[in-house]
């Protein structure tokens, strides 16, 4: 039993609350235990230069943490004048993950931007952003279809993400901050709802780990992502 009372394969209490923003075309407040991320989707009727002329659309993401989302106040990146390397890495991950959910040609020559803002952080902010960002994206695309802007929904598949790691030799999913900081191995797994991998990020802390542990962690993550898919479907029905 983990210190927070969960079993090794148990997710934290996951709540995906859709439609929380009055102005955004799609929105979702993703709560994974004490990690809370506000995800909004905005539609722009143009594409970035590298996509212009292809007839396809684009999905991208921005990520940020509120100053007091952590134990001690962080300076806003805007006040420092530039985004940090961690921020850039995470928002690129979110964008890659959510593009895997979309037929970009069916989207047409428009861009959907996901803004993922961490209100409170207790581990797994990037995976919460992807899981909640998918709901916000799906709502935005549904709205375009309902307004007849799109003839068909370009959403091709669901995408979700979860952290997984080795904690005292045990494979555990959805790590909180305390577990993440002491894990022997820490991974983030992004996958479609039918179990196809989109991205796997994994790091050994201290000593290498065998392939068998990698397989066990990926299997546990995919099982958890299957349950997250159900939460996403519930949110989109709500």
UniProtKB/Swiss-Prot annotation:
Example GO molecular function: tRNA nucleotidyltransferase activity
InterPro entries: ExoRNase_PH_dom1, ExoRNase_PH_dom2, ExoRNase_PH_dom2_sf, PNPase/RNase_PH_dom_sf, Ribosomal_Su5_D2-typ_SF, RNase_PH, RNase_PH_bac-type, RNase_PH_CS
NCBIfam families: RNasePH
Name of the coding gene: rph
Pfam family, one: RNase_PH
Catalytic activity, EC: 2.7.7.56
Keywords of this entry: Nucleotidyltransferase, RNA-binding, rRNA processing, Transferase, tRNA processing, tRNA-binding
CDD domains (UniProt xref): RNase_PH_bact (cd11362)
Biological function: Phosphorolytic 3'-5' exoribonuclease that plays an important role in tRNA 3'-end maturation. Removes nucleotide residues following the 3'-CCA terminus of tRNAs; can also add nucleotides to the ends of RNA molecules by using nucleoside diphosphates as substrates, but this may not be physiologically important. Probably plays a role in initiation of 16S rRNA degradation (leading to ribosome degradation) during starvation.
Swiss-Prot/TrEMBL catalytic activity: tRNA(n+1) + phosphate = tRNA(n) + a ribonucleoside 5'-diphosphate
Enzyme class of the recorded protein, top EC level: transferase
Signal peptide bounds: none
Family recorded in the similarity comment: Belongs to the RNase PH family.
Residues annotated for phosphate binding in this entry: 86, 124-126
Quaternary state and interactors: Homohexameric ring arranged as a trimer of dimers.
GO biological process assignments: rRNA catabolic process; rRNA processing; tRNA processing
Designated name of the protein: Ribonuclease PH
Positions of disulphide bridges: none
């Amino acid at each position: 039993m983990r210190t927070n009372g969960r079993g090794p394969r148990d997710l934290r209490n996951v709540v995906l609350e859709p439609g929380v923003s009055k102005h955004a075309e799609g929105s979702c407040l993703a709560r994974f235990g004490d990690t809370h991320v506000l995800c909004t989707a905005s539609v722009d009727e143009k594409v970035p230069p590298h996509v212009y002329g292809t007839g396809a659309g684009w999905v991208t993401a921005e990520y940020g943490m509120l100053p007091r989302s952590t134990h001690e106040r962080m300076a806003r990146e805007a006040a420092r004048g530039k985004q940090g390397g961690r921020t850039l890495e995470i928002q690129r991950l979110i964008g890659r993950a959510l593009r895997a959910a979309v037929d970009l040609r069916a989207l047409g020559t428009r861009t959907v931007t996901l803004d993922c803002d961490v209100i409170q952080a207790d581990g797994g902010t990037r995976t919460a952003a992807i899981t909640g960002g998918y709901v916000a994206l799906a709502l935005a695309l549904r709205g375009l279809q309902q307004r007849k802007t799109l003839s068909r929904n370009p959403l091709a598949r669901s995408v979700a993400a979860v952290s997984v790691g080795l904690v005292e030799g045990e494979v555990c999913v959805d790590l909180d901050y305390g577990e993440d900081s002491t894990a022997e191995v820490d991974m983030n797994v992004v996958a479609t709802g039918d179990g196809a991998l989109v991205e796997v990020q994994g790091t050994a802390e201290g000593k290498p780990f065998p392939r068998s542990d990698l397989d066990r962690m990926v299997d546990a993550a995919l099982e958890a992502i299957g349950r997250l898919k159900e939460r996403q479907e519930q949110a989109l029905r709500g």
